[in-house]
């Protein structure tokens, strides 16, 4: 087992899962989409977010810390992320009250490609994801961890992110939950938009 799992694996897994419970930009993006489009219209977001997390984990493994030496590049990523969050949030805050087609099996939803790209962009343009994985893996795993052990931890964390997000959007897409949310959907979307814009504005203010 030690060949694949480092001694601090349980600590890393616990810290990672606890961090998932703390709502961030990805969480509010998922809630905003799942509340209206259900699982069919938001599953691609989960895949995109997981893919973005996977890329950052790979970068950490191969030497993400080197990028920190190029301050201008990291600042550019932060600015891009802030503007992206503001853009997503601006669309959600314009949500208007309207009834959900709860019994309509062919309710129009974003294409799978659009969902994946939106989720991928949300994950990649949030530098905190990179810093989180960098801090988590370097602090908990230590300098003696092997490449195979790092890869095992990386696969585990990506699968946990994907599973958690799918569970979240599945719950939001249940008919019983949808019926309770129907009248307040526009308010949920607007709230999610305000939160996303808040994240973007905070990053923009901190960087500038």
Pin down the residues of each PLM region.
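Hydrophobic/aromatic residues within the transmembrane alpha-helices of Major Facilitator Superfamily
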Residues: 17, 21, 54, 90, ...
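Core segments of transmembrane alpha-helices
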Residues: 122-135, 192-196
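Alpha-helical transmembrane segments and their lipid-water interface positions
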Residues: 26, 52-63, 85-91, 130, ...
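Selective transmembrane alpha-helices of multi-pass membrane proteins
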Residues: 70-100, 157, 161-167, 179-208
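Cytosolic-biased juxtamembrane loops and peripheral soluble domains of multi-pass membrane proteins
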Residues: 93-122, 173, 178-180
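Juxtamembrane transmembrane-helix termini in multi-pass membrane transport proteins
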Residues: 2-75, 135-153, 157
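Juxtamembrane cytosolic amphipathic helices that cap and anchor the N-termini
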Residues: 7-8, 110-115, 127
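Short alpha-helical transmembrane interface motifs in multi-pass membrane proteins
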Residues: 10-15, 83-86, 117-121, 152, ...
